[in-house]
Amino acid sequence: MKGLDDSIGRFLDGLDQAGRKRVLRPVDPLPAGRVRVGGRELVNFSSNDYLGLSRHPEVVERSRRWLNEYGAGSGASRLVTGHLAAMEALEAKIARCKQTEAALILASGWQCNASVLPALLDKALWGAEPLVFADKLIHASLHAGLELSGARRYRYRHDDLDHLESLLKAHADKEGPRFIVTETVFSMDGDVTDMAALAALASRWDAFLYVDEAHATGVLGANGFGLSPGMGAELAMGTFSKGLGSFGAYVACSARLRHYLINRASGLIYATGLPPAVLGAIDAALDLVPRLEGERTRLQMMGRRLRDGLRAAGLDTGPSASQIVPLILGDEGRTLAVAKALEDRGILGIAIRPPTVPPGTSRIRFALSAVHSDADLDRLLAAILDAVEATP
């Protein structure tokens, strides 16, 4: 194609000039929350492996066992021959964990949100165009699903349930079903939704409640299975790639809704089923998570300790209340410089900049893990204070 390289080159040059050109850096995972980058060992405070399950011996062993028993791949989409009997049993286990009638496994969190939401919001299903009320800071995959759906969308101020209710009131005369879309733990700020208040509001307005539990799964709630169980959310999705240490996503919902999604969600219909090794890792993680209450408690204590230390130094950690603690620096250049200074001190903390976060809120997002030691946390806090002081 004529002009392709020139067009792409101009685009990449523009990103470079704006300081926003992303590159991929090879990383070698190591035990105990470490990684090797560019030949150097760093303490990794940017991974979502919150419980360290990606290297847990039971997870690795069951993954290996299912690989040996069922082979390297599922071989087809689930509606053909890729729906393994082991996957059917695994979905029943997920449903029990989430206290729902049924569950459905999909290939990734992005694929889940980007295909389930358009299926749910199909005007042909409801006989009228749905109205969606979404938190302003929901994940890009949720925005993508809503955009693909074409439904009417209204954004409420982040975590502001009063504003949400005012929007529901303002549009009460409009025809069509109501949907509320949000997250229980927000990935960039680390704040936690008041699930009880949100569920009560959804019930008052007869709204379908869709919650993304990607960063709560494994970490929060009774037995570590998130904040949605028992709260009446019509659909809770989550991932296996963070607190559960492997890969993939799930939807927990009613049996009838599961059957509908099997017939309408493109991310399931047209995608090859997850490989057996991944399913085995998920199965083991689900067995382990209820036994890790001590690790979850310690993880939250570590989050409080890091927030307290940073706030005592006058640094901005936003509304964080979880294992995700942002250091909000605002300026993109300074954020990159502090991240580099941390790396020089043996700490991996990735700079998060627009468009991932709003302009003026660039930050380093620290993700804590149960495998980090108290000494690791001491080292992190000291390195942050030193790096910030050295990078005015």
From Swiss-Prot:
The keyword NAD does not apply. GO terms for biological process: biotin biosynthetic process. Pathway: Cofactor biosynthesis; biotin biosynthesis. Signal peptide: none annotated. Substrate binds at R22, H139, T356. SUPFAM superfamilies: PLP-dependent transferases. It catalyses: 6-carboxyhexanoyl-[ACP] + L-alanine + H(+) = (8S)-8-amino-7-oxononanoate + holo-[ACP] + CO2. Its EC number is 2.3.1.47. The modification N6-(pyridoxal phosphate)lysine is found at K242. One of its GO terms (molecular function) is pyridoxal phosphate binding. Pyridoxal 5'-phosphate binds at G109, W110, S187, D212, E213, A214, H215, T239, F240, S241, K242. PROSITE patterns: AA_TRANSFER_CLASS_2. Keywords: Biotin biosynthesis, Pyridoxal phosphate, Transferase. Its cofactor is pyridoxal 5'-phosphate. Belongs to the class-II pyridoxal-phosphate-dependent aminotransferase family. BioF subfamily. Homodimer. NCBIfam families: bioF. Catalyzes the decarboxylative condensation of pimeloyl-[acyl-carrier protein] and L-alanine to produce 8-amino-7-oxononanoate (AON), [acyl-carrier protein], and carbon dioxide. This is Putative 8-amino-7-oxononanoate synthase. It comes from Paramagnetospirillum magneticum (strain ATCC 700264 / AMB-1).
